[in-house]
Amino acid sequence: MTLDDWVQSHRFLDPLAQVRRRIDAAVEQAMPPLPPLSGWDDYVEDFAIGVPLLHSQIPIDLEPGGHAVVRVIHSLASDPQCPTLAEDAAALSSQFQADPLAPRRIVDWLLGDDAWEPVRSGLLRSVGWITLAAGLRPLVQAFTAWRDDDRWLRRYCPTCGALPAMAHLVGVDPGRRRFLRCGRCASEWRYGRTGCPFCETESHRLASVGVDGEGGLRIDYCEACRGYVKTYNGQGDESVLLADWTSLHLDLLACDRGLKRMASSLYELEPVASDAPPPFTTASGEAECESRGNMASLR
């Protein structure tokens, strides 16, 4: 199944898919791959005590990623096809042009430094992490090959430290394994089959909400903390079904059931009034291309 096939069968994702295509095209032009590390010896100690790679003492120059984010935002600001997106991007671009330290501030802010405040924080969070994830791909692949998954059975991302947005069940019982996936940098890591990745409660099994006709996607949630993770129970469509934004309707379903999204999101889910049209007919917000609706936006 391709991404186009999925969007074609989930037409409410169309506006967000259009925005993602424009962002992805701008990122492809602006973000060169960051080089992988020459060695991992300096990270061994931090890894052993649970320090995520991008928060460790190992020297990783992410400032080129900050410069790439500036270029992507500048490109989006001049996109006539998405005027609302262009307007928000133009506000960010003006802020960047007035600050020669903007590339460094962007990277620090994406990693959790609140000393600086962007004028369109949601848009920068979305575009910033989409851009950084593209540049970090070779590093993430090398990191995955180097580390022993059995030594990182932690609830947060080994690369950037975020809580998981998705999970993937791999293999068959009794040896089936669960891998968590970061919604920011797209890293994957192994975690226990039955533990909650948010409050770390252990139970015989997590509660689940199945969704018919959704390609093996379901919602797994913890009855103790009510946190949930969207889970793909299948093989072959990982690039589509583990993308987070392609299953935002499951986030709405979870919200309707009183469950909590613990992971950070690059998209905002907006409440729908009881007399409004069904929430899966449009997607919108600050970064819409045509009409404003009620499902999701780049904040």
Regions found by a protein language model. Name each.
Residues P138-G258:
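Cys/His-clustered metal-coordination modules, chiefly Zn-binding fingers
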